[in-house]
Design a protein with these regions (language model features):
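A short glycine-rich beta-alpha junction/loop motif
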Residues: 8-11, 113-120, 151-176, 327-335, ...
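Periplasmic-binding protein-like
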Residues: 142-146, 357-361
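Sequence-specific dsDNA recognition surfaces
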Residues: 11-12, 29-47, 60-90, 110, ...
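Non-catalytic DNA-recognition/assembly elements of restriction-modification systems
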Residues: 7-41, 164, 172, 176, ...
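Short coil/turn segments at secondary-structure boundaries
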Residues: 41-49, 148-150, 224-228, 258-266, ...
Length: 437
C-alpha cells in the first residue's frame, strides 16, 4: 500500500487541493528562470551543421511528445563562441509554449543546448531540483491550467503568465526522492508503451504486406503470372494490365483551391487541407475551415475522389473522399484524381497504400532536388489493373482484412492511452504529495 504523509493542509490552490503540511506553495517564477530561445531561418541552417566545439540546437520537432525526450542529434549545432543564441543549462526543462504543441511537448535536458523561440527554458534556481520541476510541469493538472491560459490566433501562453502559475516546493531532499522514484516508475511505463508501439508497427507492416500482395498478385495464388514490366510492381496475374493513372481518370488531375479558409460554418463546404487528413479520415480534433460557395466552385469533391499530397513532409499521402463527410472542397497543396467508371476507386486507393506505391515515390524523390510530386508525375504513375469485377472483389477482401487488423491496432492504441493516463496519475500523486515515496 502506498505511503502518505502524516498531516496535510489546504494549500489554497483549487487545482492542487490538500498538500503535506511541510510543503510550501510558490509560483513558477520562484523556482526557475524562464526564457525563450532563438530561431534559425531555413536558408541559414547550412551554417549550423558543424558539431565540433558546438552545442546541440533543439527545435520543437526534436521533442517526443510521448516519451518527453529531446533528440540531440538533429544535425543543427551552435558554436560555443556564438553569443547570438541563448543557452539552456543541464538539468533544465524545455517546454513548447506556442502553436499546436504548446504545453504538450516538454523535455528534461541533460546537457547544454540552444533552442528555438517557441520553446521556453525552465532553468532551476539553487535549492530547486530540476527533475522535480520537470515532473511538476508534466502533471495533468498543470497541463490543464496551462491550456486554460492559452490565447491568441496561434495559441500560446506568454512568459509573464507562466511565471505566475502556482507551484509546490517540498524540501530539496524530498524533491530528489520524488524525481528518482518517478524516473523509475515512468521508465517502466515507457517500456510498456514502447512494447505496444512495436506491436503496432508490426501490425501496420503486416497490413501493408496484405494490401501489396492483393493489389499486385490478386487473390488466387494459382493463376499464371507474367512480368509487369515495372520493377517495383514485379510479377502480376496473366489477365492483368498495367496502366498510367492518367488513363483511368475522368478528365485531368486537378490542383485544389488556392484560397485562405475561414472558420468552419455549417452550410458552407468544409475546406480540406492535408492537415485535416489522418489515417484516411477527416479529423474533427482540429480547427476546421470553410470556403465560401464562390471560392469552392470547381473544387467540390465527389464520392470516392482520391486526393494526393504534392509537397511538404506529407508528400505522396493519399485520401479517398466519402460522401459521409458532407460537402468538401480541397486545398491547393492537394491533387484530385476522379477515377473513371471502368475502374474501382477503392482498389486504386488501396494501391496507394502498398509498398509498390512507396517504392514508386522513392524513385521520384531520387530524381528530384526537393520532395515534390506534381500532377505531371502522378499522371504517369503505373498501376496494376485487373478486370473491374476483380478490382471490386479485391477491394471488398481488403475492406474486411484491413478492418480486422485496424481493430487489433485500436486495442494496442487504447492500451497506450491507458498507460499514458496511468503515468500522468502517478506523476500527479507524487508531485502534489498525495502519496509519499
Amino acid at each position: 500500500m502506498a505511503k502518505t504523509y502524516d498531516t496535510y493542509k489546504d494549500c489554497g490552490i483549487a487545482w492542487i487541493g490538500n498538500i503535506p503540511s511541510e510543503w510550501k506553495t510558490c509560483r513558477i517564477k520562484d523556482t526557475s528562470l524562464l526564457y525563450t530561445g532563438n530561431s534559425i531561418k531555413d536558408e541559414e541552417k547550412d551554417f549550423f551543421q558543424d558539431m565540433n566545439e558546438a552545442r546541440p540546437y533543439i527545435a520543437t520537432k526534436d521533442i517526443d511528445a510521448t516519451y518527453m525526450s529531446a533528440n540531440y542529434n538533429n544535425g543543427l549545432y551552435i558554436k560555443h563562441t556564438d553569443c547570438n543564441f541563448r543557452i539552456a543549462p543541464p538539468s533544465s526543462t524545455l517546454m513548447c509554449i506556442e502553436g499546436g504543441s504548446a504545453g504538450r511537448k516538454k523535455a528534461f535536458i541533460d546537457r547544454e543546448v540552444s533552442f528555438v523561440n517557441k520553446l521556453c527554458c525552465f532553468a532551476p534556481f539553487e535549492g530547486v531540483y530540476g527533475k522535480y520541476i520537470y515532473y511538476f510541469l508534466c502533471s495533468p493538472n498543470f497541463e490543464d491550467i496551462f491550456n486554460s491560459k492559452i490565447t491568441g490566433l496561434i495559441g500560446g501562453v506568454n512568459i509573464p503568465t507562466l511565471k505566475n502559475i502556482e507551484c509546490l516546493l517540498p524540501s530539496i531532499s524530498e524533491q530528489k526522492a520524488i524525481a528518482t522514484y518517478l524516473d523509475k516508475k515512468c521508465g517502466e511505463i515507457d517500456s510498456l508503451i514502447s512494447l505496444q508501439e512495436e506491436m503496432i508497427s508490426e501490425l501496420q507492416a503486416y497490413k501493408q504486406s496484405v494490401i501489396t500482395e492483393a493489389v499486385t498478385k490478386g487473390l488466387d495464388s494459382n493463376v499464371p503470372m507474367k512480368d509487369s514490366g515495372v520493377e517495383w510492381i514485379g510479377m502480376i496475374p496473366e489477365g492483368w494490365n498495367v496502366s498510367s493513372l492518367k488513363h483511368i481518370i475522368n478528365g485531368h488531375l486537378q490542383y485544389g483551391a488556392n484560397e485562405s479558409g475561414t472558420l468552419f460554418e455549417e452550410g458552407l463546404p468544409r475546406y480540406v487541407r492535408i492537415t485535416d487528413i489522418l489515417d484516411n479520415k477527416l479529423r474533427e480534433d482540429i480547427q476546421k475551415q470553410s470556403l465560401t460557395e464562390e471560392q469552392a466552385s470547381g473544387f467540390i469533391l465527389q464520392d470516392k475522389d482520391i486526393l494526393f499530397a504534392r509537397s511538404g513532409g506529407t508528400v505522396g499521402k493519399s485520401f479517398i473522399y466519402r460522401r459521409k463527410y458532407g460537402r468538401c472542397a480541397f486545398a491547393g497543396y492537394l491533387i484530385k484524381a476522379a477515377i473513371n467508371q471502368k475502374n474501382d476507386a477503392d482498389f486504386i486507393y488501396y494501391y496507394t497504400l502498398s509498398s509498390s506505391y512507396d517504392e514508386w515515390k522513392k524513385r521520384i524523390f531520387i530524381q528530384a532536388t526537393i520532395q515534390n510530386i506534381g500532377a505531371d508525375k502522378y499522371s504517369l504513375m503505373e498501376i496494376p489493373l485487373p478486370p473491374l469485377s476483380e478490382q471490386q472483389a479485391i477491394a471488398s477482401y481488403l475492406d474486411e482484412k484491413t478492418s480486422q487488423i485496424d481493430s487489433l491496432i485500436a486495442i494496442k492504441q487504447e492500451k497506450i492511452t491507458e498507460l499514458k493516463d496511468y503515468k500522468k496519475s502517478i506523476i500527479y500523486e507524487y508531485v502534489t504529495g498525495k502519496k509519499k515515496v
